[in-house]
Amino acid sequence: MDQTVYSNIPRYTYDPYYTDNPYYGGWAYGTLDPYRRCGGYGGYGAFAIPPWRGLNSYEGFGKVYRPWAGRSLLVAPAIYRAGSGPVGSTPWGSGRQVNAARPIGGR
């Protein structure tokens, strides 16, 4: 990577492979190998497998019990996909905002 030493900038801000703790590497994903800090979860670099995906379609955060789904599983954790913003009045969350009718005489 970049071997330049910037004076007062912490090295972990510009070197994605640097870490103080040998068990955690890089910016995003921890690595399971304390000696080759090449990024965990398969270590594909920028294409690292996010921890909620994994390689096994049966287990993992935000997974659906569908082994035939392949790589078309949720790309982000279900808690992020569930919708941010106004919750909405439908049982399905915030797909479309449906405002409840006001009570009679209410303001």
From Swiss-Prot:
Q: Which UniProt keywords apply?
A: Virion
Q: Which GO terms describe its cellular component?
A: virion component
Q: Main localisation, per the record? A: virion
Give the residue ranges for region: Disordered: 88-107
Which compartments is it annotated to reside in?
Virion
- Identification of the protein by name: Uncharacterized protein L585
**What is the species of this protein?**
Acanthamoeba polyphaga mimivirus
